[in-house]
Structures are given as C-alpha cells and as structure tokens.
Amino acid sequence: MAAEKKKFNVDAWEPKTQVGKKVKEGTITDIDYIIDNGLPLLEPEIVDALLPDLEEQVLDVSLVQRMHKSGRRARFRATAVVGNRNGFVGVGMGKSKEVGPAIRKAIAHAKLSLIKVRTGCGSWECGCGTAHSIPFAAKGSCGSVKVELLPAPRGVGLVAGNVAKAVLGLAGIKDIWTKTFGDTRTTYNFAIATFDSLNNLNFVGYLPEHKKTLGINEGRV
C-alpha cells in the first residue's frame, strides 16, 4: 500500500501522560527534545502533533493462528511503517480479530518506536558530503533475517527489497546498497531487521572531523 498522510486535530486530543500534556500545552515543541532526552513516548498522538508531515504505510496484513484448548483461534497481524522522509522512521506490528483494528495498532506501535536516522555520504565513490545516503555500513537482524546497509553514491537509488525500500524511503534515505540473509519473505522480520540496522547507525562512534567529510546528520536535514 502507498504511504498516506493524515491530519491530526490537536484540540480534540486529551493527553494522558506528562509528556503528552506538555506537548499540548506547547511546552515541548520538538520531537528531537523527547528522543534526545530519553523521555517516554507512550502516546502516538505526541508524534502526530510534533511531526505533522508523517506518512503511514501498511506493509503486510496476514492471518495467523494459534492453538487453544477450545480449538484454533485466528487473528490478523498487520505490519506498518511510519516516517517523514526526512530523518524519522518507525516500524510496528499489531494483532486483532479484525483487519482495521490490527492496522491501527500497527501504526500506533510504529509511532511509539520512532527513531532519529543518521544520514550522510559514506561512499568512497561519491564524497559529496550531503545527507543522501548513510555515513557508514550497519547491520541489523530479527529472527532469521539479517540486513546489511552499505553507503552508495548519489544516483544509485534504493537497491533493496520492497519491504526494506519502504522503510528506507520513509526514513529519508535516497541512495543505498543492501545485503540480506535469511527468510526475507517474513515481512515483519524483514522490516524490523532493516529498522534495527538504521537504529544501530546511532551507536557508531566517529571523530569530530568525520562529521563534515562524511556529511553526518541526525534527524531532519
């Protein structure tokens, strides 16, 4: 499914957490402040209020079953990704007896898992110093799926599977090479492995002089 933007009415929102109340009052006006200070992100409406340009995309809806003493019980499992195509992305999963609630749960979970993405230009073939790719290679995994992200020169595009392409695109990355291992047909594992590799970029240390040469940027460009 294509990514969608939805309008959020802040006035109709009744926050339940301290962070949510501060956002509605206008005390907190930037999502960076919440993420950088490790504040609890417990309401998806916080993300809606601070990132109005956020897009939502459903990656997969599947029917899952489990055995119970009364017999088989079937539920729908949805996988979704959210992002603003400019340094913020989140992936989530939701389950329910109906498709609609499962999708809504997945989108809400994706918003609560939102991270800042570190972008840059780490390809030796490019060296333009702009935030069109990633500054260095990164790996991530989920279940049997392993994903490796490699910096690519400008103009290459997103060389990745459809699921990884959706996650990387909503994160704001324009050029990248990827390597995948394991059963990538499992949409949720593939999406989380890609998300995990993006998140692992934030834990790579670098020297101050590399910030300019690699064009390292965190969050919005």
Curated annotation (Swiss-Prot):
Q: Cite the GO molecular-function annotations of the record.
A: rRNA binding; structural constituent of ribosome
Q: Which InterPro entries match?
A: Ribosomal_Su5_D2-typ_SF, Ribosomal_uS5, Ribosomal_uS5_arc, Ribosomal_uS5_C, Ribosomal_uS5_euk/arc, Ribosomal_uS5_N, Ribosomal_uS5_N_CS, Ribsml_uS5_D2-typ_fold_subgr
Q: Which GO terms describe its cellular component?
A: cytosolic small ribosomal subunit
The UniProt entry, under Pfam families, shows: Ribosomal_S5, Ribosomal_S5_C
Keyword list (alphabetical) reads:
Ribonucleoprotein, Ribosomal protein, RNA-binding, rRNA-binding
Entry's Gene Ontology BP terms: translation
Q: Which residues form the S5 DRBM domain?
A: 54-117
| This protein's record includes keyword Ribosomal protein | yes
Among HAMAP family, the record links this protein to: Ribosomal_uS5_A
Tell me, in a sentence or two, what this protein's role is: With S4 and S12 plays an important role in translational accuracy.
Q: How does it assemble?
A: Part of the 30S ribosomal subunit. Contacts protein S4.
Q: What is said about the domains?
A: The N-terminal domain interacts with the head of the 30S subunit; the C-terminal domain interacts with the body and contacts protein S4. The interaction surface between S4 and S5 is involved in control of translational fidelity.
Name-wise, this protein is Small ribosomal subunit protein uS5
Q: Source gene? A: rps5
